[in-house]
Amino acid sequence: ELWDDDYAVTFSIANDGRYSSRKEHWLRQLDYWFDESNGFAALDQCIADAAQRIGNPPSKRGIIFSLPDPVYFEHYTKAMKGENRNTVYWGDIDGVAMDFSKSEDRIKAYLWLVDAVRARFDKAGYKHIELIGFYVLSEELSVPGGFRYEYKEHDITIKAVADYCHSVNEGFYWVPYAMAPGIENSKDFGFDLVVMQPNYYWADAKWTWDQIESHIRKYGLGMELEFEGTHGEPLTSSILSHLKTGLPNPHSDRNKTRFLEYLDNARARGLYGEVPFVLYAGTDGLYELAVSKDEKDMEVYHKLCKFVVENPLKK
């Protein structure tokens, strides 16, 4: 396996994306990842199968589990219009209904999930993977004076979760978008590692590589590599030479060039071998590159593999 660790990220777990997720949806997320025929079990088996061909990995692969946001309002958009300001909607913990207008109840929900994930990992007994920490899903974090801080209070809630994770020997991670609010305060939140998304791959990219490098160095960040597969939204974001329909992708050459600039700039600017890297590849994007019969696709795939396996930080 190329990567040392994997993020288990779920972006939408409610039936209606406009409503905030409830406890039942958080449980559904757990059931998905810990299904004996899917999720972590499938990854564990995949590594076992690979070990039969190329030998056992030097260590277990780490899993970082995403923490959904305990959102203040049941329906945030309606609340901002004054139509639905319900904050007691999520469910209960030990028979007590959580009221997400209280930061202490939002913290309780976070810690409930941390405990639930740890318990399920202990019970599952995977051979090749292990839980190494938790990932804050929100890509921007608020501090006093920030946008609608009173509904978020991340400096209170996230720091409390970080402290708890560290008390039970779990890591704490964050991957914000480029120049996101909260990056400048990231050390105060208690993260073990913050990795910034350059967001350079997409057509509406706002930042230059000089600006990206400066932010990474100033705040001690890692860097995310980014591309989309054929599930990219919009479809013009796909790096593959062909679309799902089999038709040529007219945006493929542009997208390949943009992605390879990540690798080239990481090396040229001395970030390679110095800062941690993570990969975002959309839905199945890395797999699609790996099995593609297209020569240009395979060239990009092999350049990415070479970038990963030869990284001095892996040695």
Where are these regions (language model features)?
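Acidic (Asp/Glu)-rich catalytic clusters
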Residues: 50-58, 118-129, 183-190, 211-219, ...
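Generic structural signal for well-ordered alpha-helices
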Residues: 43-51, 110-122, 155-162, 209, ...
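Extracellular glycoside hydrolase catalytic/binding regions
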Residues: 113, 141-157, 162, 166-210, ...
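Substrate-binding cleft of secreted/luminal carbohydrate-active enzymes
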Residues: 179, 193-315
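Aromatic-lined carbohydrate-recognition surfaces of secreted/lumenal glycan-active proteins
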Residues: 59-72, 96-113, 131-139, 158-183, ...
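Short, well-ordered coil/turn segments that N-cap beta-strands
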Residues: 59-61, 128-132, 166-172, 190-192, ...
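N-terminal catalytic cores of secreted or lumenal carbohydrate-active enzymes
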Residues: 1-111
